[in-house]
Amino acid sequence: MTKKALSAVILAAGKGTRMYSDLPKVLHTIAGKPMVKHVIDTAHQLGSENIHLIYGHGGDLMRTHLANEQVNWVLQTEQLGTAHAVQQAAPFFKDNENIVVLYGDAPLITKETLEKLIEAKPENGIALLTVNLDNPTGYGRIIRENGNVVAIVEQKDANAEQLNIKEVNTGVMVSDGASFKKWLARVGNNNAQGEYYLTDLIALANQDNCQVVAVQATDVMEVEGANNRLQLAALERYFQNKQASKLLLEGVMIYDPARFDLRGTLEHGKDVEIDVNVIIEGNVKLGDRVKIGTGCVLKNVVIGNDVEIKPYSVLEDSIVGEKAAIGPFSRLRPGAELAAETHVGNFVEIKKSTVGKGSKVNHLTYVGDSEIGSNCNIGAGVITCNYDGANKFKTIIGDDVFVGSDTQLVAPVKVANGATIGAGTTITRDVGENELVITRVAQRHIQGWQRPIKKK
């Protein structure tokens, strides 16, 4: 049997009043990514040919935050219920394709669960994702007759007997385009809310003698939504613990999974150690035996083997060679590239610069738009003065250079191999090979000096 084409509809038009935020609900993040972006990514993983994104509240913000997403933007000007939302996309449905309905505020649904749901869909019928809850309050109840799903009753429309049912609707369903269009046209709003419920499709399918099957989600959290910040925080921690558990099983030593955040992807070698309160963002690659101290933030970095990153260091868009030591309290800004066996110490900031093998920048230093050769020593308080108020300029330092403390290198300037720069020097001209340069004012001694006295 030929596999049907698939398209997805993502409902994302809600305001999210209980978030108390100017952002539309679905733009609030899980692991640093908008909830709806998680759902869009899952729809792509399923192989969806089209993704119809139903939006409404905060439309401009939605389009700004999701500007790069390959979706069909479908505006729902009035929020009149879930069936009304899907109906806005119905003109785009192909009769012979499967349509899966997803929710922008339920970000943890997995590709594997949806594949099972699609596989279970009967010809011309509906496959419905359900879950059993100990406390089903607020959810639509699944009504069965002789084991078959015949209806879904919303909380506000349920009678006392129906309210005791534990099996509930998640809202996720699959049917073909032709059936969706046929049934959506027949949905009414004769209910307590006066809305057009997507759940009414179940009864309509039964009226047409079309089979409705239920597939139960095995993980309740996978189908949980976030309507307020408390629920959002619960989803965040669940997702982070799930990611941490996977990394632990792969051999990464995360000392406290409850205090670890992965907001992107992590590729790792063997015997990696990650202390508490570490945040990984973007795409990060860690070599073998990397140690990351408490409170560090790593974003889009590549770290070589045997590197130690000491506590409270921040690295972004940088590359670090093997056996380097960084921190504590170091900052590598975009474009920083450290070669093997380099040392970058406390309160050092490096931006758009290269540091050669074995060189040390140990404390209280700013290096920007620079090239530092191998086996150099950059003393405390050194500043590369790279900006004249309008343009940036480069500082180039050769190999085996010693730069004394409190030196200012006013770019553009070059320091040749083997040069020595005395402490407190301001360099404004190029320094030759093996030269010693000192620009300090001669030290004066005044005997019997009297300090000024405050006037009474």
UniProtKB/Swiss-Prot annotation:
Similarity comment: In the N-terminal section; belongs to the N-acetylglucosamine-1-phosphate uridyltransferase family. In the C-terminal section; belongs to the transferase hexapeptide repeat family.
Binding site for acetyl-CoA: A380, N386, Y387, S405, A423, R440
Protein name: Bifunctional protein GlmU
Its biological purpose: Catalyzes the last two sequential reactions in the de novo biosynthetic pathway for UDP-N-acetylglucosamine (UDP-GlcNAc). The C-terminal domain catalyzes the transfer of acetyl group from acetyl coenzyme A to glucosamine-1-phosphate (GlcN-1-P) to produce N-acetylglucosamine-1-phosphate (GlcNAc-1-P), which is converted into UDP-GlcNAc by the transfer of uridine 5-monophosphate (from uridine 5-triphosphate), a reaction catalyzed by the N-terminal domain.
Keywords: Acyltransferase, Cell shape, Cell wall biogenesis/degradation, Cytoplasm, Magnesium, Metal-binding, Multifunctional enzyme, Nucleotidyltransferase, Peptidoglycan synthesis, Repeat, Transferase
The keyword Transport belongs to this UniProt entry's keyword annotation: no
Region (N-acetyltransferase): 251-456
Keyword flag Iron: no
Impact noted for substituting K25A: No pyrophosphorylase activity
Chain residue ranges for the region called Linker: 230-250
GO BP term (any one): UDP-N-acetylglucosamine biosynthetic process
Example of a GO cellular component annotation carried by this entry: cytoplasm
GO molecular function annotations of the record: glucosamine-1-phosphate N-acetyltransferase activity; magnesium ion binding; UDP-N-acetylglucosamine diphosphorylase activity
Active site residues of this protein: H363 (proton acceptor)
Entry EC number(s): 2.7.7.23, 2.3.1.157
Cofactor(s) this protein requires: Mg(2+)
Organism of provenance: Haemophilus influenzae (strain ATCC 51907 / DSM 11121 / KW20 / Rd)
Quaternary structure and partners: Homotrimer.
Positions of region (Pyrophosphorylase): 1-229
PROSITE patterns: HEXAPEP_TRANSFERASES
Pfam (any one): Hexapep
Binding-site positions, UDP-N-acetyl-alpha-D-glucosamine: 11-14, 25, 76, 81-82, 103-105, 140, 154, 169, 227, 333, 351, 366, 377
